[in-house]
Amino acid sequence: MIRADLATIPTYVPGRRLNNATKLSSNEVSFSPLPAAVDAVTEATQGANRYPDMGAVELREALAEHLEVEFDQVTVGCGSSALCQQLVQATCAQGDEVIFPWRSFEAYPIFAQVAGATPVAIPLTADQNHDLDAMAAAITDKTRLIFICNPNNPSGTTITQAQFDNFMEKVPNDVVVGLDEAYFEFNRADDTPVATEEIHRHDNVIGLRTFSKAYGLAGLRVGYAFGNAEIIAAMNKVAIPFAVNSAAQAAALASLNSADELMERVEETVEKRDAVVAALGTAPTQANFVWLPGEGAAELAAKLAEHGIVIRAFPEGARISVTNAEETDKLLRAWEAINAG
């Protein structure tokens, strides 16, 4: 009755929650949606008896202007994760291959396997970054899609422009590269590729961004993809109808039009991020989290939970979200208490 291969597909595990605890496990922002977004949601719900605009025309028009692309070069989805899945479905058939770094966004292998494709995970380098040489070497005649997560989740590292340029020289034109920039707004790296530029250099690059992180709309689920219009059209073909509801579209549009206010909030997170990096002694990060590689993540998570802090433990290390001043102070007090004991 059920597909036999589903038994081999891992289940996506969200960040842990604890009642009355500070949740630093899902890379969410701590502030509420922008006031304009809240007002837009309130107004949009008045028409909740009607289906949303399936084409999200107004939002896509605004995004096209924001990204400086044509209307048919951008689409929206139920979070950038859904768009990642659509990209897999649009490019891969049974037995095709999807290459991605590991550890990275844990849904990549799930999306590949659900589509009947073969996930090809390439370990990160010793400094927790993409091994682009190894990823390029892994390309075969079955490769259809490559994900690059920049900044990478959970390590927070970024690749350089030269590294990406060298990598793209080795990627066949018929292999799509999904440049996942979910944490783009937090990225302060001077030397790194940016999808809005790369899509004009390479017809096989698709940019992926989200309103779930910096924009504070994780609960509404809106992401966007942009690039080659032919690939975007294929992604739309495999999308679930009416996937982005009216309230989500309205909130995303209002947030996009309040960029200055948004960036003030982002700068607070970046400031606190640098303080956490210094206090915990982690490597620099270009996202809204820090990464502590190595064993002992589960033990650290348990100790922080005793102090009312929830983080994300992976087999390879621990990821801790960075939010505002209040939650950062609580984290640092807990860290000091643990290390003093």
UniProtKB/Swiss-Prot annotation:
UniProt catalytic activity: an aromatic L-alpha-amino acid + 2-oxoglutarate = an aromatic oxo-acid + L-glutamate
Pfam families assigned: Aminotran_1_2 (PF00155)
GO molecular function: aromatic-amino-acid transaminase activity; histidinol-phosphate transaminase activity; pyridoxal phosphate binding
A GO biological-process term: L-histidine biosynthetic process
Family matches, as CDD domains: AAT_like (cd00609)
Superkingdom, taxonomy of origin: Bacteria
Enzyme class: transferase
UniProt keyword Glycoprotein present: no
Modified residues (N6-(pyridoxal phosphate)lysine): 213
Cofactor(s) needed for function: pyridoxal 5'-phosphate
Keywords linked to the UniProt accession: Aminotransferase, Pyridoxal phosphate, Transferase
UniProt EC number: 2.6.1.57
Function per UniProt: Aminotransferase that catalyzes the conversion of aromatic amino acids and 2-oxoglutarate into corresponding aromatic oxo acids and L-glutamate.
Family that this chain belongs to: Belongs to the class-II pyridoxal-phosphate-dependent aminotransferase family.
Complex formation: Homodimer.
PANTHER family named in the record: HISTIDINOL-PHOSPHATE AMINOTRANSFERASE, HISTIDINOL-PHOSPHATE AMINOTRANSFERASE 2
Name used for this protein in its record: Aromatic amino acid aminotransferase
Organism the protein comes from: Corynebacterium glutamicum (strain R)
